[in-house]
Amino acid sequence: MTESVLDYMTRLGRAAREASRVIGRASTAQKNRALQAAAAALDAARDALTAANEQDLANGRKNGLEPALLDRLALTPARIDGMITGLRQVASLPDPVGAIRDMSYRPSGIQVGKMRVPLGVIGIIYESRPNVTIDAASLCLKSGNATILRGGSEAIHSNRAIATCIQRGLAEAGLPPAVVQVVETTDREAVGALISMPEYVDVIVPRGGRGLIERISRDARVPVIKHLDGICHIFVDEHADLDKAWRVAFNAKTYRYGICGAMETLLVDQRVAERFLPEMARRFQEKGVELRGCERTRAIIDSKPASEDDWHTEYLDAILSIRIVDGLEQAIEHINHYGSHHTDSIITEHQGQARRFMAEVDSASVMLNTPTCFADGFEYGLGAEIGISTDKLHARGPVGLEGLTCEKYVVIGDGQLRGQEPC
């Protein structure tokens, strides 16, 4: 009898739960050994990885996959090198598991503190890029979690080949292969099953388009770590150093158009707009960035008219909306109304303005004189990230190793009894 999708996913979930107990108590040395061995296995399997990836690329071309998606799908020699380097970098990161902090004596004589522990089983749902398989698996492994990886159907052969290398590394370190499992069915019912198994899965991390993340957030029966959009702003304050503002805003938009930390809306204080915007527009237009401005903006520079929808849009492209605001208060109101609570930055030399902006803007990262594209786990010193969260519970901002753990209380006594004074 053919195994149903639900039965298959239940089997994966049960195996992951059992494996999570093993990896959760594994030593740092054992986890690092698995990561280093997985890196060596990837290096030795370059031909097999390339062959599997060519199969996915051929299927993608046959199915009319867009060139940009085919590019994301490709495992070039440089990307394989990057995956190997990534595994070794994660192995070199400090292990958060088991760290105890804030131990203090209470009046009763007991000591109370907190210990960092793994979350358990993490489900990762993602699209296209097979290198995410390595990123997610390595971070989950190092943080003591088991993981179930459900990649896009277009990358199924690549993901299987990568998972085989990771499981070789686990075996070499004496850890169960179920610590990292790839969902090998392309049936979409697998996603519904994965997000509906709280008895086996502790948290879901979706990485993909807005539609995927909205569906998972709506239907999941387990907690979700996510962000929907990266509608990031830079506000050029009346007290800004304009040379600095030109450089920072240009970098925030043009560093990479397709990342979630790219600036999508530029807000400019009316008091500096006539001095700031012409040069800013010249730089963007030379780069080929399409500008869409409010009425006051279009009175100063040549741009297309911005609509209400533009303020809500994550372009992920060479398009920028520009609005002139009356001042700091209106800039904060705009960001909190139209933004996605991801990353927003103020350009100013006035510390009072900066403090108010950073206190009142409701985003996971708030910045001063810094391009929003710095919103990244490596740039924040986390070493690597599994994604960026705009939620307020558990993790917020770039989610690295520590974000894949939680804390439990540790209480140490010496026979104290409640209700009795300590001796």
UniProtKB/Swiss-Prot annotation:
One Pfam family linked to the record: Aldedh
InterPro entries: Ald_DH/histidinol_DH, Ald_DH_C, Ald_DH_N, Aldehyde_DH_dom, G-glutamylP_reductase_CS, Glu-5-SA_DH, GPR_dom
Keyword Membrane part of the UniProt annotation: no
Enzyme class: oxidoreductase
Top-level lineage group: Bacteria
EC number: 1.2.1.41
GO molecular function terms noted in the UniProt entry: glutamate-5-semialdehyde dehydrogenase activity; NADP binding
GO biological process: L-proline biosynthetic process
Compartment(s) where it occurs, according to its Swiss-Prot or TrEMBL record: Cytoplasm
GO cellular component, one term: cytoplasm
Pathway in which the depicted protein is active: Amino-acid biosynthesis; L-proline biosynthesis; L-glutamate 5-semialdehyde from L-glutamate: step 2/2
CDD domains named among the record's database cross-references: ALDH_F18-19_ProA-GPR
Catalytic activity: L-glutamate 5-semialdehyde + phosphate + NADP(+) = L-glutamyl 5-phosphate + NADPH + H(+)
Alphabetic keyword roster: Amino-acid biosynthesis, Cytoplasm, NADP, Oxidoreductase, Proline biosynthesis
Function according to Swiss-Prot or TrEMBL: Catalyzes the NADPH-dependent reduction of L-glutamate 5-phosphate into L-glutamate 5-semialdehyde and phosphate. The product spontaneously undergoes cyclization to form 1-pyrroline-5-carboxylate.
Entries under HAMAP family matching the protein: ProA
Listed NCBIfam families: PRK00197.1, proA
Annotated family: Belongs to the gamma-glutamyl phosphate reductase family.
Protein name, entry field: Gamma-glutamyl phosphate reductase
Organism of derivation: Pseudomonas entomophila (strain L48)
Gene: proA
